Amino acid sequence: MNRIDYIRNEEKKYHDLCYEQYKLFETGSWLYKPVKTVMDLMDYFEGQTNLQVLDLGSGVGRNSIPIAQKIQNTSGTVTCVDLLDSALTKLQTYSKEHDVFEVIKTEQAAIENYYIQPDTYNYIVAISSLEHVQSEEDLKNVLHSMKKGTKTGGINCLIINSNIQEIDLHTNEELDALIEINLPTEHMIYLLKSIYKEWQEIKIEIKELAYNIVRNEREIQLKTNAITFIVQK
């Protein structure tokens, strides 16, 4: 098994377990509520109809279901892309529970293999998902596709992890971070800014985050510089 397959297998185990253990919008995990920044940006589209939203790495719908609720009476659509069928199956169930099944479209694919229709979306969201493409080259290609896929006046909202460290909490040993792309923060920001150079910057922010996860019965602290990068075409 090559490195990418191994990482994706581990990620699948972690997420499958999380989606089984925790219910969407219940306290106890990161599924508890949508990302505030993602929802706040919906104000930009106030009064617009037929909004087309793309959620890359949607998971079980933490952000896409609340977005769908906001646009459900204005003939909009949220297209949700995820690698994990377990996530999309749960997303479909949750979308029925929250009465937005008609508004949500699911597509199973690795983000780097997903074809983004040009000039189609008003709002593209990618939360902690772009660092899971296979290579830096793939990341650049996806970002260019996102740009092409955005309508004039549309917004891209990315939260992308950089400079990720994993530390075994029992031994204090630094482990090889199980992430496909782990770029230094400055490098990642430079890459994003250079690709989106002709777009209007709405917000760029770096937050140091640390949280504990369990992987293969090991308690691990995950440290990351999470970059929020929001731009308008």
Residue ranges of predicted features:
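A conserved beta-strand element that flanks and buttresses the S-adenosyl-L-methionine
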Residues: 125
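Short catalytic micro-motifs in class I SAM-dependent methyltransferases
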Residues: 128-132
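A structural alpha-helix within SAM-dependent methyltransferase catalytic domains
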Residues: 65-68, 143-147
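A short, conserved alpha-helix within the catalytic core of class I
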Residues: 133-145
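Short glycine-dipeptide loop
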Residues: 150-155
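Class I (Rossmann-like) S-adenosyl-L-methionine-dependent methyltransferase catalytic domain
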Residues: 1-52, 59-115, 156-233
